[in-house]
C-alpha cells in the first residue's frame, strides 16, 4: 500500500480521529463532537472541534482544519509521509513510501546530504582509532566529560587531517566536498581538511540527516570553534541542535529544555534529560521556534553570565506573546550547564533545574528591575512600565492581579496600561497609538460627535482621498504639480496634528515623484506613512476608487478647502484650537474662488 489517503482511511477503520488526537492533546466530549484548546494558536476558549463522523477537525478561531494527517503533521512537525509511516507501524499496516520520502531533497541537496554523511562516518571512525594513540585528544575528551557512550550517542568524531584523501578528485561530486568546506584548496593547489585536528560535532536537520558540522579545537590557542558555512541544506537559523533526537521525548513530556551550546545539551543528557536542544548561539529565530509544537513548554537554561541573561531577556521579550508555556532556569552562577555539571556534579545540576525554574514573566520582571531600571528613579519608573506592560498583557488575570498588587506599592497602576477585561494589550495599544497619530486629543472635553469633530474628520478624509488619488495615478500627480493645485488647498497651510502629518505625506509624494521620475506608489513612502493611509483605506472602501479625470482633481481640491472653511467656522467657539495662520489677502482670494465655484454649481 503506497497511497497516503488509502492508508489514512485504513487507520480510521481501526480507531477514531478523536482517539488519535486525544493521544496528543486533552479533549472533551460535547454533543456529537469533541472540543479542545487549539494547539496551533494561543487558545483560551476551546475553539478546536473534532468530528469522528466527518473525520475532520476545525478551529473556529485560527481557521486551521483538515483530517488525521493534517493534524499530526502540523502538531508533530512531520511530513505526511513520516506521519503515515509512524501510524501504519502502530496499527500494523503495510505501507511503503520510500521513493516519495527521498523527494524531500532535490538532486543537489541530496548530494550535499550524501557528502556530509560520508564525512560524518569518517570522523566517527577516526575518533575511535585515535583514542588509543592521541594523548592530546584523550585529555580533551576526559576534560569535557565525553565518554565513549556520549561520543556514540551524539556521533561525535575527530578529523585526523587525512579526510581530503578520501574523495576521488576526478569524480563529479568532489566539488561538493569543497563547497561544504570539508576540504579546502590552497593557493598551491594542494588540499587540506577544514576541521584539521578538531573534535567534530555533527549537526542534524529535523529529518535526522547530517547537514553540517562544528569543529572544536584541542589547542586553546586556536580559534575555539569552526562551523560549516551555510549551504543548500544547512541554514543555521532553521536548525536546532539535537532536535531530531529530542522531539519524541519533548512531545511525550510536553517540555523542551533550550540551551546555548552543544556541550550544554549533552550535559543535560548525562543527568537524564533527553528532551534538550541547543540554539547554537544566543538567539532563537522564528524558523527555529516553528519547529517546536505550540503545546510544548519551553524551558530556557542559558549561561549564567550577563550575556546569557541578556540573551534570555531578548528571546522572552520576542516570544512571550507567541507561546503560553515558557519558563526559565535562573542561573546565578555565571557558568553554563556543562561547567556546572563538571564542577558541582549531577545532583547540584538536577536540584538547580528543579528549584530555580520560574515562569517567564517573573524572570522578565526581575531582569528589568535588576539589570535595566531603578524603580525608585522616576524616569526609570516610566521606562520600566513601558517595557513591562506589553509583556504582562499576554498573561492571564491571575498573573496580572499579582503584579497589579505588587506594583501598587510603588504607586504604579499597571491596569492603566492594559485593556479592559483581560483583552490583549498589544492589540488595543496598537489601535490606540495609530488613532493618536490621526487625531490630536482635545485639550478639553467635547461631545463625542460634535459638529467640530465631524467636520474635522471630513476634511481629513478628503485630504487622504487626494493623497491616494495621486498615488494611484501618475498622470494625476503630474497634473497636480503642473497646475499648482497644492497652492489652492487651504488645509495644506495648517500645522495642527494629523493635518500636519498628511501635509508631510503630500510633500514626500511630490519629492519622491521628482526624484524617481516614474510611477509613484504607496510602497515608496516610509512605513509610518503607509500605515496612516492604509488605516483610512480599511475604514472607507471609497478610497479604493481612482480619480479618472483631471477635473475631478480640481473639484476635490475645492472640496477640501470648503470643508476646511466649514471646520474653521466651528472652531471659533473653541479656545483649544487655533486659526491657521493664513495671509489675509490669500484668504480673501481663496474664499472668492470657492464662492465663484459655488455660484457656477448653482
Curated annotation (Swiss-Prot):
Residues 254-334 form the Toprim domain. GO terms for molecular function: DNA binding; DNA-directed RNA polymerase activity; zinc ion binding. GO terms for cellular component: cytoplasm; DNA-directed RNA polymerase complex; primosome complex. A zinc finger (CHC2-type) spans 38-62. The keyword Zinc-finger applies. GO terms for biological process: DNA replication, synthesis of primer. Keywords: DNA replication, DNA-binding, DNA-directed RNA polymerase, Magnesium, Metal-binding, Nucleotidyltransferase, Primosome, Transcription, Transferase, Zinc, Zinc-finger. It catalyses: ssDNA + n NTP = ssDNA/pppN(pN)n-1 hybrid + (n-1) diphosphate. Its EC number is 2.7.7.101. Mg(2+) 2 binds at residues 303, 305. It is an enzyme of class 2 (transferase). Gene3D superfamilies: 3.40.1360.10, DNA primase, catalytic core, N-terminal domain (3.90.980.10), Zinc finger, CHC2-type domain (3.90.580.10). Its cofactor is Zn(2+); Mg(2+). Mg(2+) 1 binds at residues 260, 303. Binds 1 zinc ion per monomer. Contains an N-terminal zinc-binding domain, a central core domain that contains the primase activity, and a C-terminal DnaB-binding domain. Monomer. Interacts with DnaB. HAMAP family: DNA_primase_DnaG (MF_00974). Belongs to the DnaG primase family. RNA polymerase that catalyzes the synthesis of short RNA molecules used as primers for DNA polymerase during DNA replication. NCBIfam families: dnaG (TIGR01391). This is DNA primase. It comes from Mycoplasmopsis pulmonis (strain UAB CTIP) (Mycoplasma pulmonis). The lineage of its organism: Bacteria, Bacillati, Mycoplasmatota, Mycoplasmoidales, Metamycoplasmataceae. The gene is dnaG.
